[in-house]
């Protein structure tokens, strides 16, 4: 691991932080930030080397996302989400890889994967329509991975349902402006996308189940450890890394603010044992959340690198660990922010923005614990979870 991208982020830290304020104002990642991210190759970290990528260890990717998010939450969020898409494109049809990366390896892809569209088969491909929310960083992307349900030729959904990941160029979808008016992660520009009767050739479509269970990468023939990693470990990694990084940024700004503060009782925070205890506990919890997430990806990497099978139980435990890491970090900042006093609520203080952005990150579907914890517990008890309990695992 070389951490080249991380070092370059550190060298531009002051500018990246300042641009986070601009992102909040304009409702998307600032153009200057996107230019910096492209210049240092932040989105190429998980991209194949044959297409100008770095094939970085996912731990290095996660740590780099954390740092970006600690400075500029919206940029870190986009880094974590858009930065995972090259990992999946690495085992899509070589023809679409060439279309996207052939002339510019810094081409970005948006999402989301949620099935907001319908694919109706036609000659050599599909007729594709739908609407999707939450397309993070979409203003800076030229292609998108969009989730859809497979239909028959009459437009009726296949039974049992079959989900697809559709790869589509910017010319075939519309970004709906003013569709991202939210209280947190405002600077991500996670706007709605609309597709109307676009033609999608077969080679630009991936079967969702095959992506998640590893069939797609095996069919492609990839042998690199990076691309053999489970989807359930890689896809959530950037999102949770960004969330933890935002919490680290919140803690940094809280410490800076509290260092010279006198509380309402006239006591310096440095002399207040109760606040100091809360800060200490929160610091330990955020560090533990970080270390847990990184150890989780290391553990999975070592297993895959050794050629061992990753069972459903192990995938479920990995997801359980990832979800809990996010919640632990969020709970920690909730012990810090209320102890920063009334002035910490002011909009000219970064504390409130980091707090809002961290909580918005917690709302992502990948951080919902219910079915993940349920499936992990059943697996440990020797049962085989079925149906919705297997979703995103």
UniProtKB/Swiss-Prot annotation:
Molecular function in Gene Ontology: acyl-CoA dehydrogenase activity; flavin adenine dinucleotide binding; oxidoreductase activity, acting on paired donors, with incorporation or reduction of molecular oxygen, reduced flavin or flavoprotein as one donor, and incorporation of one atom of oxygen; pigment binding
Keywords: Oxidoreductase, Pigment
Disulfide bonds: none
Signal sequence coordinates: none
SUPFAM superfamilies in the cross-refs: Acyl-CoA dehydrogenase C-terminal domain-like, Acyl-CoA dehydrogenase NM domain-like
GO cellular component term of the entry, any: cytoplasm
Enzyme Commission identifier(s): 1.-.-.-
Job of this protein: Involved in pigment production acting as a hydroxylase that transforms indole to indoxyl, resulting in the formation of indigo.
Protein name, per record: Pigment production hydroxylase
Leading EC class: oxidoreductase
Source organism (scientific name): Rhodococcus erythropolis (Arthrobacter picolinophilus)
InterPro entries in alphabetical order: Acyl-CoA_dehydrogenase, Acyl-CoA_DH_C, Acyl-CoA_Oxase/DH_mid-dom_sf, AcylCo_DH-like_C, AcylCoA_DH/ox_N_sf, AcylCoA_DH/oxidase_NM_dom_sf
GO biological process: fatty acid beta-oxidation using acyl-CoA dehydrogenase
């Amino acid at each position: 691991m070389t951490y080249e991208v991380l070092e370059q982020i550190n060298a531009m830290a002051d500018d990246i932080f300042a641009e986070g304020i601009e992102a909040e104002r304009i409702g998307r990642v600032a153009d200057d930030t996107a230019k910096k991210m492209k210049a240092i190759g932040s989105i190429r970290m998980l991209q194949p080397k044959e297409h100008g990528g770095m094939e970085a260890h996912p731990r290095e990717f996660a740590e780099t996302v954390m740092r970006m998010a600690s400075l500029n939450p919206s940029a870190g969020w986009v880094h974590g989400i858009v930065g995972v898409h090259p990992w999946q494109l690495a085992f899509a049809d070589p023809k679409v890889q060439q279309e996207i990366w052939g002339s510019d390896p810094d081409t970005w892809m948006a999402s989301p994967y949620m099935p907001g569209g319908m694919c109706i088969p036609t000659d050599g491909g599909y007729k594709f329509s739908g609407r999707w929310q939450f397309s993070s960083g979409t203003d800076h992307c030229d292609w998108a991975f969009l989730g859809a349900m497979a239909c028959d030729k009459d437009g009726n959904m296949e039974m049992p349902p079959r989900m697809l990941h559709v790869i589509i160029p910017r010319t075939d979808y519309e970004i709906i402006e003013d569709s991202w008016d939210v209280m947190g992660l405002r600077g991500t520009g996670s706007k709605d996308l609309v597709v109307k009767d676009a033609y999608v050739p077969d080679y630009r479509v991936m079967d969702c189940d095959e992506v998640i269970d590893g069939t797609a990468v095996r069919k492609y023939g990839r042998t690199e450890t990076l691309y053999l990693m489970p989807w359930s470990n890689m896809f959530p990694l950037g999102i949770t890394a960004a969330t933890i990084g935002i919490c680290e940024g919140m803690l940094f700004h809280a410490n800076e603010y509290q260092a010279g503060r006198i509380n309402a009782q006239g006591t310096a925070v440095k002399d207040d044992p109760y606040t100091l205890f809360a800060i200490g506990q929160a610091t330990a919890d955020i560090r533990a959340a970080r270390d847990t997430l990184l150890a989780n990806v290391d553990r999975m990497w070592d297993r895959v690198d050794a050629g061992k099978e990753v069972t459903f139980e192990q995938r479920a435990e990995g997801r359980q660990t990832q979800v809990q890491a996010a919640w632990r970090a969020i709970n920690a900042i909730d012990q810090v922010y209320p102890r920063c006093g009334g002035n910490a609520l002011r909009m000219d203080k970064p504390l409130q923005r980091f707090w809002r952005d961290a909580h918005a990150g917690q709302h992502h579907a990948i951080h919902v614990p219910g079915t993940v914890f349920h499936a992990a517990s059943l697996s440990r008890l020797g049962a085989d979870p079925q149906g919705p309990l297997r979703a995103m695992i």
